[in-house]
Each structure stands twice: as structure tokens, then as C-alpha cells.
């Protein structure tokens, strides 16, 4: 079953898992244990739609009217594609801000959604920022809950947590660079959470802009049927507006900030292009929508309402993305995107959200009802330290949340009072008395973790929702405060871990060092800098360390006995079975005949397996891709205990692992480098020098882009080397790609270094 096709509440969970098989990633990423479902889970939007229609029949007219005016959307893209600039225009045109400020503007104010000092200094988005605004269309007022997300891969958890709670998204693509590495990553994240999207091709005013090449890349690289619903009027510096090819209307942005839209006839020189792209749009829709397909086969041209209805059906059904174009920086083409959000992205009651009813002790999938009269269910998806304490962002899926009311934390069972309820506008907040189903809000003073579920205080159903996907850290470094006062240092570490699940902290008893791990060098650099600015703690950091993995390449059997006698009752446990290599996550299973190992001891065996995964036998790094199966064993009537079998499993794991031709895996990164054409030889030479494998080279009018795979171990200091060989004009992005077996020489060096540390 494709993970991306699961209903929203269960989308990252795996159905029909045997209770004797443990996948380590489930325990790591989600709060609850393995789920087991007997119900058939919808695999397509058509199947979901049947359930959605049944739910909507139970909603009141007030609920339906409220939902129809609401859109929960995110803005996502590759770094430097113009997300925050686009969002700034959205806020200005919807009246939420009175003036436009640029991301790297000279006024030292910065974009509204980049409220952190570090974001404004570096010109990048580090944290997702939420706001809400209103937009008028066809004499109706619509409310948008909008989240601007980072484009840098190091802050990917911000994209994950935003997409987890949003109903739709605007995917921003650069008209010059087209689909880039992080565009592919964002597309994968949108599929993971079943998020429909409209696409905005930005930077149409730049030299080399080619929107139709970008659309072709969306079709080929993202494997998403896409077609333009606009064509540009003019190109590059001569960009004047866009033509809506559905209605055959030209739209010009006028006024000092492009705030006025003037509709006019299609320019004569664009008439043929408009008809060509309109025919292509209808042809593409015929491939994904039955109604248009029938008209197409009968030779009939669909009407404008039929085309718009088909685009909406196909977009919400995740079969198609309509493509708009313009330039946010030049204030052109942004307002039509807001119209497209209303026309083509779903309202809350058009998305199937599900949870797990755990009231009876047996987990059962339940559909959430976007009604304000139903019992409250909400998901805490983001935490921030505010001036009034911890700020918790909550998406309300069912019922309503009132100021002064109580709700229950599903994980701890604690009753929590909602003392203050706010709507966020970046770092500003506006108090509200209540929020209804489908809305996003924030509250203070709640002790919880990101991804926790809350329900109404008097709710009969105990409903839990799945958390967001949390990727593994790929880089680590040692850290210690310069001063001996560890109070603020510990406080910062605890807070950052709570806010960001990809930021990990552990104490290494061997080196007696605190180790922080994250998604990349920039990720960790930002936290070190934040400790200095927000807590006054200057830190000393060690050299970045790669997060290797240990794996096996051959199957083997094991027969291990743990025996310990020290007077009185001792310890005894014997386990037998086999260990085999496995693609992907680790797995533990057992099949014991005749009760040779009691159930409670088998549970201890699974715990012993989990313990063993944390520190592999070769160099003490996590283990990946191992299946351990226990099929026999032996107990002692007096000396056997859970500890005995946990220890026996740990010993058997080590014994078998070392006999199974173990190897060390290193993280391989997908690298994308862009630079002026005259530096192509230097960049290719640099990548070859690092032992990278070049996958693709795309030559543009002025710039080229190289995509390659390189070992993370060789990438430290790459930014300095790239600046040197491109005179500071080169840019690059890094994204984790896969784990691959490292060179034998490096493996020997790593093992020798680990053994040397062990002897100290």
C-alpha cells in the first residue's frame, strides 16, 4: 500500500502489522505503539470521497457555510524560490500588513513572516510562521490560515509539521531554475500527507525565465500531471501581466505596489498561444477527470464552469496541479493565485481526517467530523518559547476550543485549562474567545510535545492522532559551554529538543561529552548561535561528525546463553534463531513452539533488540537493516527473568552481527550546485575531487546546474571551496539521499579509531 494514499490521520502508519514484528521506526516517530486495523483503509481519493460525503450529510448548514469560507494552506518551495516574498505580497494584498518589506531589503525591517533576528540577518526562513488573512472573491469573504515554511533542507521538520495539519499548499517554483532538489523533497512531503497543491511559477521577470520548461519538469520530475492555466504577457524585464486562458482574459497589475488588477482583452500576438495552451489544459484534464474525458471523446469543448469544476476535482483528488505564473518581487500575478486557492484547494470538510479511538483498549480507526458541535479533538503541531511561556500551536479537527475551557492531554491523561487563546500573525498575536473545527490557533502554558493529541475534557471517546514524520539526524558534534554555569545551557538544550524533534541531544559516557545531532551543519550552527543570543551561553563545539550506520551483508544463525551466578538467584536465558539483512528499517520477530520462552520474556527479548540497535558492535553507531528472528530458547525455573532474556538477546545480537559480514554505511547526499556558466569546469572538477558522482548537468542561458551524489564525509567545508572556485557566485543545496557502504579503507580507520577510544 502506498503511504501517500492513506487517510490524513493514519497516513504514516502501517496497516496489518503482526504483533510479534517490531519496526523500530514506528516507536521512534510516533507516540503510540504498533497499530492493527481490521477495517479497509481507503487507497484513493474516490474511496475517501464516499466517506467524506457521508460525514458532510451530518453537518449543519452553519458548519458547511463556515467550512466553505476557510482554507488552510502552506507555501513551500526550494530555497530562494521566493516563498517569503510571495507570502509578503499575500499579506499586503489581503490587508494584513500596511507596507511591503523585502527579505533582504535595505530598510532593515525584513519580511513579516521572517520574524527571528537570525532569519532577517541571513535572508532565509528558519522556522515556519503562521498567520491568517481574508480574501474577497465573487462577493464572498474567505479566511486563510497561512503557514510560510523554510526551503532549506536543514529545517525540513518545519515543512513536515506544517503539511501535517494543512489541507492544501502553494508550491512555488523558480521560472529560471525550474524543479530543484528541495522541490522534489517538498513534493514527496506533500504526497506523504496527501496535500493537494496549486503551483506558482515565480521570478518570471528574471532573465532566462521559461515557465513552460518548468511545467514540463513538474510533469517529468515530480510525476504530477500539470498544465498552465495562464500564459505571461511579456517576458523577463518586459513582464506586464498574465492571461487567464480559461476565461480568455488578460490581467494587468497596476498601482504603486501592483494592488490593482485591470482586466482586458487578450493581446492579439498571444491569441494563438492562449488557444494552444488552453487545448493542452483540456487534454491534460481529460486524462485525469472522467467528465472532461467524455466531452473530449465526443469532440465537445467543455464550458468554462466545467473546466473549473474539473480542475477543482482533479486538484483535490491529488491527480493534477494547475500552474499559475508571475513575479512576487515585481508585484505581478499574486492575486490570481489567491483566487486559485479559493477555486481549487479544499475546504476542511473536503479532506478525510482520521484518528484512533482507544477508549476500549482496542485501537479502532475513527473518522473525525469537522463540526463545531462534536467533541473537541486537536493536534499540537508546533511549540515555541514565547514571552508568556510555551506557545503551543493547535489545529482543531473536531469540535471547538473556548478560552477558559478544559481539555485532556491524551498521552498523559492530564486536564489542561485553556487560559488564553490566540490567533498568530507571525510573532504577533490576537486574542480570541473560541475557534471552531478546521481552524488553527495557539495557547499558552501547556506541557506537551510536538505531535500530541488533545480532546475535550468530557469527551467519551479517547482519540489519538498520528504525529508528523521525523527524519533521522545525519550529522553530530560535541558541544560544551565556555563557562561552568550549566543551568542556562541545560535549559536551552531541553527547550530546543522539545521544539524541534530533529534536534537530538545525548551524553556520551565514554568521551564524557554532550553530543548534539541534526539535519546538517547549518541546522546545528543556528542552534549554537541561538544559545548565545537567547540564553547568553557561548559554546565550544567539536568537529562535525558523520552519523554512520552499521549493517550486515550475510545471514547467520545464533545460539546464545546468558548465565550469571553470584549467590542466591542468578540469571539465565538462552535464545536461538537467525539474523538476516533487511532493506529499510530493522525488524524483530519470534515464532516459539511449545512455550519454551514465556510471553513476558519474549517482550524482554524485543526490548533487548531495541537496545542493541542504538550502539552497533563495530563503531558504536546505530544499526540499520537487520531482521532478528528468535525461534527457540530455554529457561531456568528459578534464574530466568526479563532482565536475563533482555541481556541474552543483546549478547546474541552482538555475536550474530559480528558473524554476518558487518559493514559501515555512510550517508550519501544529493548535491545541487548552480553557478555562472564560466565556472562549470571548476565546479565539475571540485565535485570529482570529492569523489562525487555527477547525475545531471543542465545548461541555462547564463547559469548551469549540476546534480550529484557525494559522501557527507567529504562535504565539510564545501561552501568555502565553492565560493573560492566561483568567486562567491556559486550556490548549492544538500539533501540526504541514502546510506551506502563506505570504502574498506575508511571502515578500517573508523573501527581502529573506535577501538582506540574504548581502550582509554
Swiss-Prot record:
Pathway: Protein biosynthesis; polypeptide chain elongation. HAMAP family: EF_G_EF_2_B. Residues 68-349 form the tr-type G domain. NCBIfam families: EF-G (TIGR00484), PRK12740.1-5 (NF009381), small_GTP (TIGR00231). The keyword Transit peptide applies. One of its GO terms (molecular function) is GTPase activity. The gene is MEF1. Residues 1-37 form a transit peptide. Pfam families: EFG_C, EFG_III, EFG_IV, GTP_EFTU, GTP_EFTU_D2. Keywords: Elongation factor, GTP-binding, Mitochondrion, Nucleotide-binding, Protein biosynthesis, Transit peptide. Its main location: mitochondrion. Belongs to the TRAFAC class translation factor GTPase superfamily. Classic translation factor GTPase family. EF-G/EF-2 subfamily. It is found in: Mitochondrion. Mitochondrial GTPase that catalyzes the GTP-dependent ribosomal translocation step during translation elongation. During this step, the ribosome changes from the pre-translocational (PRE) to the post-translocational (POST) state as the newly formed A-site-bound peptidyl-tRNA and P-site-bound deacylated tRNA move to the P and E sites, respectively. Catalyzes the coordinated movement of the two tRNA molecules, the mRNA and conformational changes in the ribosome. PANTHER family: ELONGATION FACTOR G, MITOCHONDRIAL. One of its GO terms (biological process) is mitochondrial translational elongation. This is Elongation factor G, mitochondrial. GTP binds at residues 77-84, 148-152, 202-205. One of its GO terms (cellular component) is mitochondrion.
Amino acid at each position: 500500500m502506498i503511504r501517500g494514499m492513506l487517510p490524513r490521520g493514519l497516513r504514516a502508519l502501517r496497516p496489518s502489522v503482526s504483533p510479534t514484528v517490531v519496526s523500530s521506526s514506528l516507536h521512534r516517530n510516533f507516540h503510540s505503539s504498533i497499530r492493527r486495523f481490521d477495517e479497509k483503509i481507503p487507497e484513493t481519493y474516490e474511496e475517501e470521497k464516499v466517506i467524506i460525503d457521508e460525514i458532510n450529510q451530518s453537518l449543519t448548514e452553519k458548519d458547511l457555510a463556515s467550512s466553505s469560507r476557510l482554507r488552510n494552506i502552506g507555501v513551500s518551495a526550494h530555497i530562494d524560490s521566493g516563498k517569503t516574498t510571495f507570502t509578503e505580497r499575500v499579506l499586503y494584498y489581503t490587508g494584513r500588513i500596511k507596507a511591503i518589506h523585502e527579505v533582504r531589503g535595505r530598510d532593515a525591517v525584513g519580511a513579516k513572516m521572517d520574524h527571528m533576528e537570525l532569519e532577517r540577518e541571513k535572508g532565509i526562513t528558519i522556522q515556519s510562521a503562521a498567520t491568517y488573512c481574508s480574501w474577497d472573491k465573487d462577493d464572498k469573504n474567505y479566511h486563510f490560515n497561512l503557514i510560510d515554511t523554510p526551503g532549506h533542507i536543514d529545517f525540513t521538520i518545519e515543512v513536515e509539521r506544517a503539511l501535517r495539519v494543512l489541507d492544501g499548499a502553494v508550491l512555488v517554483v523558480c521560472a529560471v531554475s525550474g524543479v530543484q532538489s528541495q522541490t522534489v523533497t517538498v513534493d514527496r512531503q506533500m504526497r506523504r500527507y496527501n496535500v493537494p497543491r496549486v503551483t506558482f511559477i515565480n521570478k518570471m521577470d528574471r532573465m532566462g525565465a521559461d515557465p513552460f520548461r518548468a511545467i514540463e519538469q513538474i510533469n517529468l520530475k515530480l510525476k504530477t500531471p500539470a498544465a498552465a492555466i495562464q500564459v505571461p504577457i511579456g517576458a523577463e524585464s518586459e513582464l506586464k501581466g498574465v492571461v487567464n486562458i480559461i476565461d480568455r482574459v488578460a490581467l494587468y497589475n497596476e498601482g504603486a505596489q501592483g494592488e490593482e488588477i485591470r482586466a482586458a482583452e487578450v493581446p492579439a500576438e498571444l491569441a494563438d498561444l492562449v488557444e494552444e495552451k488552453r487545448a493542452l489544459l483540456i487534454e491534460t484534464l481529460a486524462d485525469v477527470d472522467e467528465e472532461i474525458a467524455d466531452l473530449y471523446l465526443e469532440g465537445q469543448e467543455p464550458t468554462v464552469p466545467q473546466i473549473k469544476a474539473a480542475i477543482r476535482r482533479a486538484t483535490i483528488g491529488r491527480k493534477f496541479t494547475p500552474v499559475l505564473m508571475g513575479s512576487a518581487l515585481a508585484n505581478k500575478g499574486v492575486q490570481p493565485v489567491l483566487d486559485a486557492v479559493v477555486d481549487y484547494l479544499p475546504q476542511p470538510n473536503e479532506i478525510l481526517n482520521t484518528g484512533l479511538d482507544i477508549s476500549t483498549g482496542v485501537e479502532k480507526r475513527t473518522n473525525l467530523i469537522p463540526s463545531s458541535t462534536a467533541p473537541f479533538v486537536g493536534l499540537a503541531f508546533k511549540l515555541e518559547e514565547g514571552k508568556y511561556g510555551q506557545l503551543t500551536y493547535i489545529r482543531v479537527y473536531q469540535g471547538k476550543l473556548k478560552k477558559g475551557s478544559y481539555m485532556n492531554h491524551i498521552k498523559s491523561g492530564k486536564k489542561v485549562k485553556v487560559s488564553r487563546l490566540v490567533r498568530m500573525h507571525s510573532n504577533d498575536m490576537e486574542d480570541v474567545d473560541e475557534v471552531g473545527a478546521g481552524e488553527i490557533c495557539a495557547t499558552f502554558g501547556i506541557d506537551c510535545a510536538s505531535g500530541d493529541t488533545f480532546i475535550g475534557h468530557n469527551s467519551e471517546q479517547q482519540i489519538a492522532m498520528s504525529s508528523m514524520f521525523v527524519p533521522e539526524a545525519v550529522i553530530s558534534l560535541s558541544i560544551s559551554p565556555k563557562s561552568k554555569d550549566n543551568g542556562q545551557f541545560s535549559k536551552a538544550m531541553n527547550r530546543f529538543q522539545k521544539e524541534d524533534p530533529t534536534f537530538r541531544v545525548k551524553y556520551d559516557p565514554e568521551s564524557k561529552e554532550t553530543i548534539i545531532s541534526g539535519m546538517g551543519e547549518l541546522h546545528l550552527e543556528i542552534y549554537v548561535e541561538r544559545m548565545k543570543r537567547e540564553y547568553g551561553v557561548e559554546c565550544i563545539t567539536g568537529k562535525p561528525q558523520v552519523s554512520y550506520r552499521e549493517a550486515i551483508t550475510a545471514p547467520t544463525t545464533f545460539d546464545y546463553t546468558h548465565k550469571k551466578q553470584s549467590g542466591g538467584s542468578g540469571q539465565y536465558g538462552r535464545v536461538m534463531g537467525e539474523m538476516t539483512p533487511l532493506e529499510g528499517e530493522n525488524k524483530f520477530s519470534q515464532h516459539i513452539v511449545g512455550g519454551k520462552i514465556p510471553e513476558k520474556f519474549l517482550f524482554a527479548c524485543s526490548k533487548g533488540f531495541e537496545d542493541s540497535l542504538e550502539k552497533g558492535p563495530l563503531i558504536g553507531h546505530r544499526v540499520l537493516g537487520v531482521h532478528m528472528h528468535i525461534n527457540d530458547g530455554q529457561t531456568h525455573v528459578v534464574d530466568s527473568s526479563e532482565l536475563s532474556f533482555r541481556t541474552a538477546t543483546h549478547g546474541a545480537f552482538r555475536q550474530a552481527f559480528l558473524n554476518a559480514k558487518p559493514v559501515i554505511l555512510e550517508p550519501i547526499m544529493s548535491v545541487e550546485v548552480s553557478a555562472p556558466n564560466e565556472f562549470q569546469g571548476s565546479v565539475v572538477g571540485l565535485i570529482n575531487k570529492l569523489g562525487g558522482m555527477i547525475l545531471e548537468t543542465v545548461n541555462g542561458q547564463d547559469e548551469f546546474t549540476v546534480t550529484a551524489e557525494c559522501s557527507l564525509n567529504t562535504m565539510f567545508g564545501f561552501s568555502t571551496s565553492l565560493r573560492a572556485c566561483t568567486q562567491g557566485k556559486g550556490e548549492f543545496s544538500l539533501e540526504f539521499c541514502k546510506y551506502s557502504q563506505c570504502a574498506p579503507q575508511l571502515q578500517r580507520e573508523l573501527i581502529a579509531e573506535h577501538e582506540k577510544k574504548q581502550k582509554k
